Every structure is written in C-alpha cells, then in structure tokens.
Amino acid sequence: MKFNYKNICLAALAACSVTACDLDTAPTTSLEANAVFKNLENADRVIRGAWNYIFNSGSTYASIGYGAIMINDDFAGSDVVRTTSYGYSSSYKLTNGYGRGEINDVMWDMVYDPINNCNAVLKNIDGISGDQEEKNRIKGQAYATRGFLYMLLASHYSFAIDKDPDAVCVPIYTEPTDYDMATTGKPAASVSEVYEQALKDLKWGYDLIPTDYNRGSNATDQYKIDHIVVTGLMARTSLYARKWEDAYKYADEAMKLKNNYLMSEAEYKSGFNNALNKEWMWGYSCTLDDNLPAYNFYYKDTTTPGGGYTNFNTDPHFKELFDKNDYRRDLFKWGLNTGYGECAMLNYKFLFADINNMLGDVIMMRVSEMYLIKAEAAAHLAGKTSEAQALLKELRDARMKEGFESPVVTATGDELLKEIWLERRKELWGEGFSLTDIIRNQQSVDRKKYEEYAMADITHDSKGQEIRTPKLDENGDVILAPEDATDEYKEQNCMLISGHSTLKFPDDSDFEANSKYYLFRITEKEELQNKNLYNDHPKLSIYR
C-alpha cells in the first residue's frame, strides 16, 4: 500500500478521468488544488475518485475495498463458517484487529484517503462558479461520504458508545492534510466525538443533496449517494450512536421513500447481485472494465460451478433459527463447495451474476435494514413497544412462503430487543453487520460445536476417487445416520459433517462481550508517526 493517506499529497483526490467506468481515476501527486477545482465537473470527479478508492483499494485479492471489510465482519461473527482455502483466516480466527492483520491495515488507508478527498472538495467547492443546486449536490455528497467513513471508524475502532463515551477512537480530520499535518498528526478523538462528527456530516449531506436528485437507472450509478441513501445512513448511524428518536425518524422516512418495499421470494433467491433490485437502496455495480470489487464473490458464492475460494459457508446451528416455512431457510444446504469440494453447509444467498466475466453487484443498504432499525429504535422508545412488535412481524411475514404467516410477536423489553437482534442476523446474513452488531450491543460471538454423521451419496470421479455427498431430504435438510449406527455402518454409508472450527479466542479463552479481539486497531505506522495520537484520550487499556 501507499503512504498512510491522511497524508501528504493531493494524490488520489485529484485527476479523475471518466472513461469506460464512471469511477475510473488516474491519481497524481503533481496536480495543484486550483487546477483540480477549476470547475464542478472536476469536483464531482474527486468524489467519484474517493469511491473508486473505497471499492478498489487493497493489498491482495483477499482485501479488496469495502466489500472485504464486510466479509471480514461476517467471518468474525457467529454465523459464517470458513472452510479451508485462501483468504480471511485471520478474520475468522479473530486475529485481524488485535494482531493488526491485512484487513486491519487496509481499512485505515481505505477510509482516510477518501476522507482527504472529501476535505479537499469541501475546502474548495464554494470558490467554484456554477449551478448552485449542482454545487449543493456535490458538497452534500462529500459531507455524506465523509460521514459514512467516520461512522465506519467509530463502529470498528472502539467499543459501544454507551460502554465508555470518552474512550479513545481515531483522529478526526476536516481539512485537507498538508505536509506538516501529515508528519505530526492530530490527536485521536473519543468514540462519542467521532459519532458526533459522522452525524454532523451526514446531516449536512441530508440538507444539501436535493430531494429530487436522481442518480438515474443505470446500475453503475447506484453507488452515488442520493437523498434516500443519506436518509438511510442517518438512520444507521443514529442507531449505532444510540440516538433512538433520530434512528426511528430517519428509518421511517427511508422506508416511505422506498414505499416500504420488501423483496419477493423469487427476488430474495436471485443471488443478491443486482443493484437495480427494487429493495436495494445503495449498491455498487461492476462492469467488464471495472470488476475488481466483484472478486469478493469468489469467497461468498459457494455453489456456482467454476467458483474460486468458496469459503463463506454457514453455521448449521444458524439454519435451525429459521421457521420451517421461512423461505430464507432454503438458502442454506449441505453440499460440496465448488472450489475445493469440501463438505459444508453452503450458502445460496450470494451468487455471481456472471462468473465467466466476474460480475456481481455489492449490496450496501436495503429496505429491510430500515425495518429493523425502526423496530429496534421503537423498542427503546416509550409507548412504541407494540409498533416494534408489528414491524418485526411485518418483516417476518414477508419472508414466509406463500400461504404461511409468522407467529404474533409478544416479547417486550430486553426479550424483544433480543428477537430484533436475532432477526438482523437472519435477514442481513452475509451483508457485513455481524461484527458491528456484536460490538455496539455488547454481545459475544456465539459459536457452538457441530459434528454429526450424515447419510452419504457415494460416487466416483473419472480417476476412480470416491466422492461422498450428504443426502438431503425433500426439505433440503441433511439425513443423519441412524442413532444406533455402528462404526462399520458409518464407514460404509456415511460421512462426518461439521460446522465451526474456531470455537475460542486466539488466546484459547472463551468468547465474551467487549473483547479486544473484536476491535480494529490503529495501525503501527500511525502510532509511530503520530506523536499527538494519545494526547487527548489515553490508549485503551487492552493495548497497554
């Protein structure tokens, strides 16, 4: 990776040339700000350049952009099982953050480089002549992008805001970084201050981006932040910051802007690869000329023939959490992954749109998240318990097979919150929320051993090598060996199937809440270069 990019140059903020892909950029360190910001089109290109970096930066194929952060966060949670292959071992074993692994360091640059882009836009755009509404839109998107990035930092580099609002988090930069600042650095702010900055930026974006701004119907434009997206980000960030009234208000508004649309069963089972899906609020679409972010599907798609690493599999205990008539349950089945032929509970939720051309869109926000945010916020607000229950049931009903209805929700208080958190795990599985939810709710990773003998279909490949595949019943569930099966019977007719392989923290201690192994960690380079880092707030005791 390049320099730690709160850093020295105008570099990636600068020369973006729009060619085959709207996000194509050609960074240079030699361009001065007055040359870059001579018109609104160039300012807009700087924002597009920031998003290019967010989606495409990384150090290896196992750390490509924001999609890799989302994969990391789910591997570090309770419900994704990593099978043997390249990539994300440290994420699954929970050594990435505390041990300063690859994803940990990539995240730092992935966030602070674009923040510097946004700061440059905000410093210079008022001096550019042009249409005021267009200027407001670009300025609003710069604020919203920066707010989104500070939300990412606040939710990954510190424990929950209510655990210790004054705990150290990360530095806040709101001006372009010059040489002096890059070589000295700013003190790290507290987690509450970082959330405050995120919300302030997002509110500016909310106020400035015109409500009638239309990013168009092209899939490749769906990453652009419009009024719906910034409203959703206000809801998400308010939830993380435990501002329940705001979370409720903005989630409700976002739902209405999308007509409360929830996917049909057919749409839900279509592969989560299309940014034009009517429930999606925000997504990134790859093209033939810009498909690097879709490389992440080589991990997440475990079933398409010709797949790559196929290691993003499912905890068998997780499937048991679904109602028998919940169609989401159908997305998790035992089988042999297509990359390595390893037996696992595969996921059918994420599929390449076109594996031959490495195409598939990245989901970043959809309406069901807004339902869950509104329900969780309502559960915290006086007099809104029944509304929280109704919202939870409405979402569950939308995920039931035709002709079936979910049970009435009767839980209240903490039990209702637990049901909502569980529904987040079920509905948003694989979409990058696991680790953040564990941190912000002060919960623990929950992984249990799973090991059973299943009946096997036995075939042979062209070389005569035996292949055993778990037998499934008509409901897609594995057929287990008889309870009285002898060892000889199992050897002849069965196969051993298993779930999680990592069941404790790296130091062999049991999983618990508020562990140092959940957090991302300020990079060693930053600690060495930034002499002011801990001037205002002391280093977390877990690192001392």
Predicted feature descriptions by range:
Residues 3, 20-70, 322, 403-404, ...:
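Membrane-proximal, proline-rich intrinsically disordered regions
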Residues 33-34, 61-78, 157-173, 211-296, ...:
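Short, surface-exposed recognition loops and adjoining beta-strand edges that mediate ligand/DNA contacts
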Residues 47, 115-118, 195, 202, ...:
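Inward-facing hydrophobic residues that define packing positions of alpha-helical scaffold repeats
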Residues 85-157, 189-192, 206-211, 357-362, ...:
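Conserved, well-structured interaction surfaces
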Residues 195, 244, 384-385:
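TPR-repeat structural position
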Residues 224, 248-367, 401-407, 413, ...:
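Hydrophobic-face positions in mid-chain alpha helices that act as interaction patches
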